């Protein structure tokens, strides 16, 4: 079915490589968190119960033992220096660990609120959001980044506040993005038949997982995205941007 004839009730969008450039995430957000984590922890270590909980959760992930084993002197206690080093270790390895994502979101929040950060979105995103909302569709987000971090990108975007267009947010608490059950969980949470949800992503494995749960899927080929193999191109519907989806309509 051509994109121009497609119907749906919900558009579920990925962020990195779909609404937002991969370079913004990897070249701006990740370095910002890495460079500011020690200062953030020093300021909140004693005063924030949320940070204390994140620190406890970080110590429970499998990579924590791996990291401490690499240290010349094993730490006798957990302190700012140890957690700072571990967070930077996780960022360098691009590991999608839930407490890391939560901590990054808190650090980024400070950056957005001070104006040091502004969320990148591609030029076609605002118009598509408006068109889908006007057509009566709901827009939801599913990203490995925490819900808080998702909201910051759209609230403090380079084109202004886009958060009002979004009706739901999902992160790894609902499941990993290449697992079919995650998309079944999202459909259940949204109260929609999976076939009425259109998932937009740049990752073939995510698209395959969503399709196996009954969702419609399209893969974005944005600048900077990982090139697709011939088999991936053949087995997926592909678009370069959202412009061909402005005519999305609700099912009759």
UniProtKB/Swiss-Prot annotation:
Pathways involved: Amino-acid biosynthesis; L-methionine biosynthesis via salvage pathway; L-methionine from S-methyl-5-thio-alpha-D-ribose 1-phosphate: step 3/6; Amino-acid biosynthesis; L-methionine biosynthesis via salvage pathway; L-methionine from S-methyl-5-thio-alpha-D-ribose 1-phosphate: step 4/6
GO molecular function: acireductone synthase activity; magnesium ion binding
Function: Bifunctional enzyme that catalyzes the enolization of 2,3-diketo-5-methylthiopentyl-1-phosphate (DK-MTP-1-P) into the intermediate 2-hydroxy-3-keto-5-methylthiopentenyl-1-phosphate (HK-MTPenyl-1-P), which is then dephosphorylated to form the acireductone 1,2-dihydroxy-3-keto-5-methylthiopentene (DHK-MTPene).
Organism: Drosophila persimilis
Entry annotated with the keyword Signal: no
UniProt subunit comment: Monomer.
Pfam families: Hydrolase
Cofactor binding remark: Binds 1 Mg(2+) ion per subunit.
Matching HAMAP family: Salvage_MtnC (MF_01681), Salvage_MtnC_euk (MF_03117)
Cell compartments where the protein resides: Cytoplasm; Nucleus
Protein name: Enolase-phosphatase E1
């Amino acid at each position: 079915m051509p994109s121009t004839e497609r119907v749906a009730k919900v558009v579920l969008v990925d962020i990195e490589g779909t609404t937002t450039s991969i370079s913004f995430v990897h070249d701006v957000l990740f370095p910002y968190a890495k460079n500011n984590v020690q200062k953030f922890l020093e300021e909140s270590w004693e005063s924030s119960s949320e940070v204390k909980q994140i620190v406890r959760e970080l110590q429970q992930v499998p990579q924590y033992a791996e990291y401490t084993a690499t240290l010349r002197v094993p730490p006798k206690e957990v302190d700012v220096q140890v957690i700072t080093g571990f967070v930077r270790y996780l960022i360098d390895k691009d590991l999608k660990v839930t407490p890391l994502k939560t901590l990054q979101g808190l650090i980024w929040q400070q950056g957005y609120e001070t104006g040091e950060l502004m969320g990148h979105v591609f030029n076609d995103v605002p118009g598509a959001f408006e068109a889908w909302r006007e057509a009566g569709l709901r827009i939801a987000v599913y990203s490995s980044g925490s819900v808080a971090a998702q909201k910051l990108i759209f609230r403090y975007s380079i084109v202004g506040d886009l958060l009002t267009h979004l009706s739901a947010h999902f992160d790894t608490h609902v499941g990993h993005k290449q697992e079919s059950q995650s998309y079944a969980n999202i459909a259940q949470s949204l109260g929609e038949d999976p076939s009425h949800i259109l998932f937009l992503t740049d990752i073939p494995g995510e698209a395959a997982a969503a399709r196996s749960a009954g969702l419609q899927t399209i893969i974005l080929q944005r600048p900077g995205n990982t090139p697709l193999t011939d088999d991936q191109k053949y087995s997926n519907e592909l678009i370069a941007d959202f412009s061909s989806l402005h005519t999305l309509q609700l099912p009759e």
